[in-house]
């Protein structure tokens, strides 16, 4: 599976190191946001990597909504709690990082899931430098390009 080098499984939990997360952001998503640099003071795992892991583990449904609830730091053991129509990505303390709602037919076709995942995260990774930054500049909005912090709630 193409995601294997971007996380590990320890005692039944998914664990993502800062280096693994950063490599995914840069190599797969084309996302060079400094917050995904392994040595960033406010490092966080890219939501796109969690999105990709959910699809790889649980398949792709016709309708899916991903709600990002918390920033994920490095090396947090994650569990995936699945019900009929939801998947929660959380830690052992119960802190939820992503809530996924899904409905409709589900495919587990690995080739299709990888193709869709790669296409989606490649577009998502370019969202900040190619879409948001020019839009903000054209509207006279100031931000620090060395430390951009763009957060979104859902996709």
Predicted regions and their residues:
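Catalytic strand-loop segment that frames the active site of acyl-thioester-processing enzymes
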Residues: 1-42, 63, 73-76, 81-134
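Active-site helix/loop of acyl-thioester processing domains in fatty-acid/polyketide metabolism
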Residues: 43-65, 118-155
